[in-house]
Amino acid sequence: MNLAVPAFGLSTNWSGNGNGSNSEEESVLYQRLKMVEELWERVLQSECGQELVDLLTELRLQGTHEAITSEISEEVIMGITQRIEHLELNDAIRAARAFALYFQLINIVEQHYEQNEQQRNRWEASQETNFYEQAGNEEEMVPPSRLGASTEPLPVGIDQNELQASVGTFHWLMRELKRLNVPPQHIQNLLDHLDIRLVITAHPTEIVRHTIRRKQRRVDRILRKLDQLQGSVTGRDWLNTWDAKTAIAQLTEEIRFWWRTDELHQFKPTVLDEVDYSLHYFDEVLFDAVPELSKRLGQAIKETFPHLRAPRANFCYFGSWVGGDRDGNPSVTPEVTWQTACYQRGLVLGKYLFSLGELVAILSPSLHWCKVSQELLDSLERDRIQLPEIYEELSLRYRQEPYRMKLAYVTKRLENTLRRNNRLANPEERQTMITMPAENHYRTGEELLEELRLIQRNLTETGLTCLELENLITQLEVYGFNLAQLDFRQESSRHAEAIAEIAEYMGVLTTPYEEMAEEDKLAWLGVELQTRRPLIPQEMPFSERTRETIETLRTLRHLQMEFGVDICQTYIISMTNDASDVLEVLLLAKEAGLYDPATASNSLRIVPLFETVEDLKNAPGIMDSLFSLPFYRATLAGSYHSLKELQNQPPDYYQIPTTTALLNPGNLQEIMVGYSDSNKDSGFLSSNWEIHKAQKSLQAVAQSHRVILRLFHGRGGSVGRGGGPAYKAILAQPAGTVDGRIKITEQGEVLASKYSLPELALYNLETLTTAVIQASLLKSSFDFIEPWNRIMEELACTARRAYRSLIYEEPDFLDFFLTVTPIPEISELQISSRPARRKGGKADLSSLRAIPWVFSWTQTRFLLPAWYGVGTALKSFVDQDPVKNMKLLRYFYFKWPFFNMVISKVEMTLSKVDLTIASHYVQELSKPEDRERFDRLFQQIKQEYQLTRDFAMEITAHPHLLDGDRSLQRSVLLRNRTIVPLGLLQISLLKRLRQVTQEAETSGVRYRRYSKEELLRGALLTINGIAAGMRNTG
């Protein structure tokens, strides 16, 4: 098999901007890209014929444009468009499918390369001293860990991209902390209360089927096998070995099977389908990755600070919204949430049972050759009495093997636990289930842990170590019996509606609740929250919506009783506008038995979510009013008694992170900040600045009330929804707001890119953990320089005005958006259990969710939400004093982590924008009578883009976009060269589809040649392909 020549168009001498040579590692990447590309071509040739391959070759070669900042010419666009317009629908669909498959294959190769690169970087970091020590110039350098970047030149021989690759690992971090003379006791204090929580969410635009994800993993495994073969065979003939030929044949067949598989969901997934999808990442990767993360951190600490203790094993913990998030999703019912908890427990118990089977094979020591403690012998005797059937079955086989006998009892109890869980998942059996004897199964993971630790102690006392047993214990410490904590979320208006209906039925208010002023609501709610008298009658004669709201809190209570409090402690209130929104949920929690007014004890953490810019501005005042209520403060402390003890402590007691009382979850308030709706509301720059300010203010309010704050960041996958590299984002948080605690959403769309492969998962978890420790110990003071804050306030206000003047004040913009983007067709995708609009809203921007909003602009190559308004803001500031202010903005970029993060995200987004393609969406999808007004809007967008791009390149001093991130630059350029034809295919299919739809609506006559369903399928396939090509949905 000859793989020496690529099928088409990948330049082998590209180095990011066209001026340089590839590294050895990039050469390996391009070898794999060529191989996969040629196999893709061969499969298409055999499946569809040479004519399709020739068509794809022609379209791709015409669409190729080299530089990352250049746009394809109108002449080329017209040539491709004319070719596409003459395609039969079946050929257009096949072309769309082929391009989508191509991009997904390229993604796998890149992801595979990234995984190898991350392994190599980690190994180098563990072997070498840091770069500054190698260069012998450390005294003169300002560490990038503190500043985000430095204006001083790097030491001789150190490349900026090389330096970036070295940071983010535990070994690098610990050496950096030592180099900066951070006191070991400060490091230990932080490690002792390190608390990182990652929350998996379902994603309304998660476009890739589960079936396709499995194929992606199989392709990756074959690529890994080829890497091993290439590394083990010397010389250039490794491709001619029998093993290599076999692997390439397997890869060819995987691509062939993929081509013959439907890319689109054939039905709208249920919530439980989404639960299954999210649990897959735990099953395949995360179950083993998180314990490995703990080991890696412990090893790095030991090598640099041998006297420090590693953090507890579950310092990084996963939660989930899938099955618990009912905001705007009527499909998430109490029964679905219960089923989700059972599914999670069933998966983790099955993993433990498999591990126990492995231990039985390993732990074979005999009493003939080793001793065991009396404690273990006593436990075996108790087991014999409690589980006599196991003794009768296995006592002869294991009579001299105490560990195997013990594991047999443990296995039986765990099997009974799993059997009981399966019956709990069945609604019919749940009602009639006979309770098992307590000694025959485990109620909690801690009970199983005690038995495994008993075995571990015996092994240690006799000089034995079992790595597999240690791994299982760590997994139990991390995942328990629930795998992930379920967060509940509901919109604030649902609780207000329920309280209003309850109050009206009970006749307890003279004024309807919904008409009361905020201070009157707080007064009445305060009274109700300080009495044990129930408010809700048992029969619940209310509307279905109110009954469901009440039942949700009761289900939460039942889940805690059956699965333990850890299964669900968090209740998030979206669209929190007032303090009463929080107290309404607390009142419903009281009625469900989750809160006792007499003692203030409770088992629920209520989390307000502030999403819009207005809510973010009001958030500090809302929390101040809540913290000022004695009964609310007592709920945070855990009880009135605990609050009194805390108030008797000295003032600085609450400012010292070493105090163990601060680790008490009862003294903690979690607050969530939303990136998606604030961005949609006010634009990228304003949103980021308002969130930054709100965090500082919330931290100050919490500290003034002696409350510990944990900020929950609702970051999306795209830049327009707060996405981007987590490492930079965490370092850009205001100083003092992280302090070893952070909670972040991991959106469904990014799960595959972060957690589909073990080393990728570990890399993401390690860089995230490194950033949290780094941000907590090396705090930047730049966030508190008042003149800088005033400048950012000015920039944010100007950007917000520019953004809203287009999005909300331009009367033609809504029509423009609905016409030139595929938002109507996106709603047809069978990809989510949740509707695209809130409350079944009408076609306006206020009801449209942020995710399809961003998804639509990404498809059309505008990517508008992630940059619009930034250029106007920067120009307005620079024009006041061009030389001085441009110098100041550059200084911000190189010194201030927050500003660096903002500009870096804008730069990355601009690299993906192609307004030449976007203009064709406008020209081809607009009606003749709309073109003049739509062209005016497009010219306004184009002017803002050019302005933003020019300023981004000027501030960063990059001759080309992304010159500071070679890997990302390479990836973006690779896609920009190929995605053009797919966008034009989408335009053609959308145009045909809308024409057919319009004719059917106006005349009732269907377009005879192609049905609406056929055209819709073709359009959806292009949406699928562009999402893969952009590596982004919403």
Curated annotation (Swiss-Prot):
Keywords: Carbon dioxide fixation, Lyase, Magnesium. The keyword Lyase applies. GO terms for molecular function: magnesium ion binding; phosphoenolpyruvate carboxylase activity. Gene3D superfamilies: Phosphoenolpyruvate/pyruvate domain. One of its GO terms (biological process) is oxaloacetate metabolic process. It is an enzyme of class 4 (lyase). This is Phosphoenolpyruvate carboxylase. It comes from Synechocystis sp. (strain ATCC 27184 / PCC 6803 / Kazusa).
